[in-house]
């Protein structure tokens, strides 16, 4: 009986050690699961959709035989509305979010493409209709682009500088010639 008591006490001791080891906290594994579910993907989707929608409207305008302002005004107003809606959607995200570098690069590419599309549209409108005819539309386009860039700079710190680097071939003189003065100020380009 004495041997049975010793064996059971040893078994209970081993069992208590196993309970102790199971109760110890374990280190969490290194995973990036939360990084993929952040607001960076939402921002990327907004910018990609913006580029797609603006490109579709610019293509529609390119296929129109421009003779008078009324031919193009509805389509330019639609572009202004698309950019404004995207800018308002961007500002609803958190301020100064941290996103991956590859997502940030994709966002910069989309925004730079939107700026290029709008600048090319402005150049086309001025060439075909004249500055005095489309000046009101140019000012509206300038305001909506300024809103987009300002809201992007609120959400992602330093993104405006990356956009400037990507649109370096569009000089400040071109932006000034198409009357996008507010964009010049936001982008920090000298005349």
Annotated model-derived regions:
Residues 1-38:
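Fungal secretory targeting signals
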Residues 25-191:
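A taxonomically broad motif for mature regions of secreted/extracellular
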